[in-house]
């Protein structure tokens, strides 16, 4: 099982939608979507399109970043999920951190289920030692997602006895794109082959984005395409960077400098293709710059599909 964590921004949801049929066919990927802004009809339609392909996501009830971080926002978000029938096809995820009102959220979940809404429930245990959670607070939990399975175990039964998805964030987030120039490729994950022997159900990560959250970005001196690929029993990470990084001018030119390196690398290694790589190759052949949001979308797609294939 692979559970990528995304902030549910436009291109992130697009990436999931584009891969939905592949996820449905493999039954190995369940994305966790954490809205950072109030959902709207477009968000609902995209989730509907994902469900129509046979795929399912976890929708976070209590986001930890963005416009919905305030403690009272979770109830309005949860009601939106119910009113728009999103939990008929998708599951619910609760983030366990110091801001989580577990007592109130567990009551809301019980009331929703009592009213006839049937949905799966997963608990994502954040790295926050101030959390106090009783193992019997939530009922009908499916999985724990945690960086260490001893964390949910410490809360007692029945929560502590459930299967755990092994979470981490191996992506090397740097303040500026230029800092990736000259950075050597490295191992992104060894867990794809070892999670079962370590006693876990699956793995979870923040893809080629990292845990950190920034509400927006501006012009950059360098364009970087973050690219993962499977090599033996590990998933490796490489950063393809532009060359003309002295000014912020010509982002399209910078993109093609980085893209040419990526295409050459894929061809030299004879890497298996996927929807993300196909998207990059199409842009290269047409010499089309779609904007950096689309570049991020294709990077995410490639990573999710690489992880899907790497999970044993």
Report residues per predicted region:
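Long, charge-rich C-terminal accessory regions
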Residues: 131-274
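Hydrophobic, glycine-enriched assembly/anchoring segments
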Residues: 260, 267-312
């Amino acid at each position: 099982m692979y559970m990528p964590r995304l902030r549910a921004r436009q291109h992130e949801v697009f990436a999931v939608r584009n891969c939905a049929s592949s996820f449905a066919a493999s039954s190995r990927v369940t994305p966790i979507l954490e809205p950072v802004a109030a959902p709207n009809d477009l968000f609902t339609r995209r989730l509907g399109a994902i469900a129509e392909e046979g795929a399912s996501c976890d929708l976070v009830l209590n986001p930890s970043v963005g416009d919905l971080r305030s403690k009272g926002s979770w109830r309005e978000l949860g009601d939106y999920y119910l009113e728009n029938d999103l939990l008929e096809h998708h599951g619910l995820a609760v983030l366990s951190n110091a801001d989580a009102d577990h007592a109130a959220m567990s009551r809301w979940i019980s009331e929703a289920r009592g009213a006839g809404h049937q949905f799966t429930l997963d608990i994502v245990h954040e790295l926050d030692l101030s959390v106090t959670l009783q193992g019997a607070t939530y009922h009908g939990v499916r999985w724990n997602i945690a960086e260490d399975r001893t964390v949910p175990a410490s809360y007692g039964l029945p929560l502590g006895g459930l299967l755990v998805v092994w979470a981490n964030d191996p992506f090397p987030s740097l303040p500026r794109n230029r800092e990736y120039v000259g950075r050597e490729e490295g191992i992104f994950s060894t867990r794809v082959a070892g999670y079962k022997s370590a006693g876990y159900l699956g793995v979870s990560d923040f893809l080629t984005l990292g845990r950190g959250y920034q509400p927006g970005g501006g012009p950059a001196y360098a364009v970087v395409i973050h690219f993962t690929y499977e090599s033996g029993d590990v998933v490796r990470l490489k950063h393809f960077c532009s060359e003309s990084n002295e000014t912020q001018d010509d982002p399209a030119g910078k993109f093609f400098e980085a893209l040419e390196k990526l295409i050459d690398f894929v061809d030299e290694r004879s890497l298996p293709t996927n929807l993300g790589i196909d998207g990059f190759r199409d842009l290269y052949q047409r010499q089309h710059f779609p904007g950096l949001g689309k570049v991020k979308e294709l990077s995410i797609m490639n990573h999710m599909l690489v992880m899907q294939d790497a999970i044993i």
